[in-house]
Amino acid sequence: MAITVSSRQLFIDGEWRVPILNKRIPNINPSTENIIGDIPAATKEDVDLAVDAAKRAISRKNGRDWSAASGSLRARYLRAIAAKIKEKKDELGKLESIDCGKPLEEALADLDDVVACFEYYAGLAEELDSKQKAPISLPMDTFKSYILKEPIGVVALITPWNYPFLMATWKIAPALAAGCAAILKPSELASVTCLELGEICKEVGLPRGVLNIVTGLGHEAGASLASHPDVDKISFTGSSATGSKIMTTAAQLVKPVSLELGGKSPIVVFEDVDLDKVAEWTVFGCFFTNGQICSATSRLIVHESIAVEFVDKLVKWAENIKISDPLEEGCRLGPIVSEAQYKKVLNCISSAKSEGATILTGGRRPEHLKKGYFVEPTIITDVTTSMQIWREEVFGPVLAVKTFSTEEEAINLANDTHYGLGSAVMSNDLERCERLSKALQAGIVWINCAQPSFIQAPWGGIKRSGFGRELGEWGLENYLSVKQVTRYTSDEPWGWYQPPSKL
């Protein structure tokens, strides 16, 4: 049965609105290269309307509608949204799959996480009520001080195409739990499920303007949103190059930003491991989500004594991965998201080969798939640390391999990068794992696994992988400002100045 993609408009102030310039962008299914629909293309004029709607939502009834309402009221809406998503899970999963090429089983698992994320932040919204007016211990008993946590205000949420609904939720759920009003700008390459969230918000009666969804091109809708003077904070997930531009724009207005950017994460494999078990984790860490993960452990650093045998096993695992239309049962690798990204991935592989690297397996379109932006899982050896394939993010199913002889050498290879998002260490020596968890320069360290993420645990990087943390309590704090309230409690005058003479 054909999957129907609804023709949505922009979601602004609780209503569907045609873009002022009436522009639209075609949706291309990366598995078939066929147009499956289109999305509205917002411009500055539409962004202005969305920001105005968010401002009104914050201030309506002196905030009692949303920003100053109880956390328990906001939690009810978040749970209602979660319930609707759960109800529509199968439909949303298929839409996600044909929109961005994600294997259906992955898309459905993402939606389970979406539901759990809204429910988790509903709980934190309720807890926020009891944490208000937390007292501060002071050295002077003539003063009493406490803390208020208040929503930052209007927030711009700019999200990527590799986890369209899930990464939007990582931002939306905590922002709304905090009492902010948001404008979501998803990637133009994968906006379909994010637009469906607008319909869900209508169905649950979310107050107007609390969540606005503007789709469109980055240089039009995204840039207008990032530079808008009435946006109080920007949260961005995407490339380091775009993140740098957003940071520069925000600096002109001294505006806070949270950035989750690119990565070139290492996976360090020591000689004492179970080779088959670690081979699967290594393949999963790099090729999951079609290799399009910002935290992909795409630099394998393996002990020289096991390198030949281990890489041979990796090749067998990689060549056994089912590559197919993502809607097919058992698909474990779908297409790259777009033609431009597909060409970029192939160019990176070609560049590595021209620089002297060896393509052990993959590096091309699978023979059985004549259409779609498919790339076989690719393993590259004979790599030097100066090669582009070792230093720059590919965002495709490509693993580069180097060997090491000592623990110190492994650490130096792992940390020799501008990025610092994820990292993994594989060893049965837990003391060694502990040493590396401290030595690796990354926001996340996985021990004897790769890529697990949990709503309760912080997610984010260091160096050029950005700053700020999403998920867990840290995700909520992203959207809260801290206000100190201090009261003088003594009946005595302050007594700093000599009082004026009484005539």
UniProtKB/Swiss-Prot annotation:
UniProt keyword annotation of Ribosomal protein present: no
Pathway where this protein functions: Amine and polyamine biosynthesis; betaine biosynthesis via choline pathway; betaine from betaine aldehyde: step 1/1
A single BP term in Gene Ontology: cellular detoxification of aldehyde
Active site: 260, 294
Binding site for Na(+): 27-28, 99, 189
Enzyme Commission number, as recorded: 1.2.1.-, 1.2.1.19, 1.2.1.54
Localization annotation: Peroxisome
Gene Ontology cellular component terms for the protein in this record: peroxisome
Motif Microbody targeting signal per UniProt: ranges: 501-503
Record field: catalytic activity: 3-aminopropanal + NAD(+) + H2O = beta-alanine + NADH + 2 H(+); 4-aminobutanal + NAD(+) + H2O = 4-aminobutanoate + NADH + 2 H(+); 4-guanidinobutanal + NAD(+) + H2O = 4-guanidinobutanoate + NADH + 2 H(+)
Name this protein carries in UniProt: Aminoaldehyde dehydrogenase 1, peroxisomal
Organismal lineage: Eukaryota, Viridiplantae, Streptophyta, Embryophyta, Tracheophyta
Protein's gene: AMADH1
